[in-house]
Amino acid sequence: MEDFVRQCFNPMIVELAEKAMKEYGEDLKIETNKFAAICTHLEVCFMYSDFHFINEQGESIIVEPEDPNALLKHRFEIIEGRDRTMAWTVVNSICNTTGAEKPKFLPDLYDYKENRFIEIGVTRREVHIYYLEKANKIKSEKTHIHIFSFTGEEMATKADYTLDEESRARIKTRLFTIRQEMASRGLWDSFVSPREAKKQLKKDLKSQEQCAGSLTKVSRRTSPALRILEPMWMDSNRTATLRASFLKCPKK
């Protein structure tokens, strides 16, 4: 699973997922399913905000990356992917500026057009079940919830899907592709079922033991783009690189 994640997701997303797991004391070598889930959630959050801006009239517009309109305001503020301290700093700043009610839990995005925080969910289960779990946890009508599944289903607060149909279709297509690629590598069942995940982990550990005697040369290269952008990747151009380089899963 770890190899699959590194092949199929943008290196910057992988880096952010690694940092998130390290912050919470989780080992990605063991919790590979969580590693994949975090990367998937991050990518959906970035895709959700992709190309969406607010013009001078306060209207939401879609602008392609090649468009020279750099002065347009991003419609969405990305909160997910930041360390907790910085994330809460951003949330507090938004609340002070807009008058929005401070959420109890860290949300994923803020929508400047609708003036609301958004919680994004990506589930391997039924969307309505996951939606209810999110709603029960958040317990706030102020935070908008939008759930996507790997089967193309979605559910949102008051059936308000925020984005246009084409933007949502991009997200659904990407999730379906991830599912298909996992399935082609025999990883999907373990990703969905914790019991299957434990079996897969035992197989992986056994395989590692068998290979322990052989020397392996591992590349530890750091992406030049990541060196340049970090820690500035969340500035006004924070998603430019990500927009241009979402990686497709290579063929098996």
UniProtKB/Swiss-Prot annotation:
Q: Which UniProt keywords apply?
A: Decay of host mRNAs by virus, Eukaryotic host gene expression shutoff by virus, Host cytoplasm, Host gene expression shutoff by virus, Host mRNA suppression by virus, Host nucleus, Host-virus interaction
Annotated Gene3D superfamilies? Influenza RNA-dependent RNA polymerase subunit PA, endonuclease domain
| Entry-linked Pfam families | Flu_PA
Chain positions of site Important for efficient shutoff activity and nuclear localization: 195, 198-199
Query: One MF term in GO for this entry?
Result: RNA binding
* Domain comment in the entry: The probable endonuclease active site in the N-terminus and the basic amino acid cluster in the C-terminus are important for the shutoff activity. The C-terminus acts as a nuclear localization signal. The C-terminus is recruited to host protein complexes involved in nuclear Pol II RNA processing.
Q: Briefly state the protein's biological role.
A: Plays a major role in the shutoff of the host protein expression by cleaving mRNAs probably via an endonuclease activity. This host shutoff allows the virus to escape from the host antiviral response. Hijacks host RNA splicing machinery to selectively target host RNAs containing introns for destruction. This may explain the preferential degradation of RNAs that have undergone co- or post-transcriptional processing.
Name of the featured protein: Protein PA-X
What species was this sequence derived from?
Influenza A virus (strain A/Chile/1/1983 H1N1)
